[in-house]
Amino acid sequence: MRKRSWLTSAISLLILVVLSCSPQGNNLSIQVWFSPGGGCTDAIVGELNKAKKEILVQAYSFTSQPIAKALVDAHKRGVRIEIILDKSRRTEKYSAADFTSHMGVSTYIDGAHAIAHNKIMIIDNETVITGSFNFTKAAEERNAENLLIIRSKQLAKDYLDNWEKHKAHSEKYIGR
């Protein structure tokens, strides 16, 4: 009960911070999803399928086949995709890094930190997907996770600035 209360408080605080930082007319929209079994993966895939220009990803663990396939499908539609992953993905047995890089998606490894623990997507410079949800089957089916889909150009810009800092020190992943 305490953990749930803490999680609810943390999410509420995040929403208040986002709302207070948003300029008027930013057309802020927030959707929240929970797992297990709450449709987080489907929500992410739905957003990826709507992308028109660009999807930027930072992920710690990334083994979800539906999400990897949606990214590759977007790449085939001409959407620019770039993925930054934690250094542990080089050796993870079921990492999507090999699949995405072999399919032509620009994939990078961030080895500059003890753990590159971000879980974000920036879509078309206006939508941010973030939360505790790792892009994995376990996160969808077994773990207690949360996911936010936030439509805000200003927030997307803030996340983009941070994403670019991480890309600057990341190395291109060419697969195994």
Q: Each predicted region: which residue ranges?
A:
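Solvent-exposed loop/turn segments at secondary-structure junctions
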Residues: S61-Q65, K87-T91, H113-A116, T127-V128, ...
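Boundary/entry segment of secreted carbohydrate-active catalytic domains
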Residues: G25-G39
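Positively charged n-region of N-terminal signal peptides that target proteins for export
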Residues: M1-S5
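Bacterial Sec-dependent signal peptides at the C-terminal "C-region" and cleavage site
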Residues: T8-L28
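Structural recognition of the beta-strand scaffold that forms the well-ordered cores
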Residues: L56-Q58, E82-L85, Y108-I109, M121-I122, ...
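Extracellular/periplasmic catalytic domains that process cell-envelope and extracellular macromolecules
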Residues: N49, T100-S101, H113-A116, M121-D124, ...
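Primarily the HKD phosphodiesterase
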Residues: I44-S106
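Signature of lipid phosphatidyltransferase scaffolds
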Residues: T127-R176
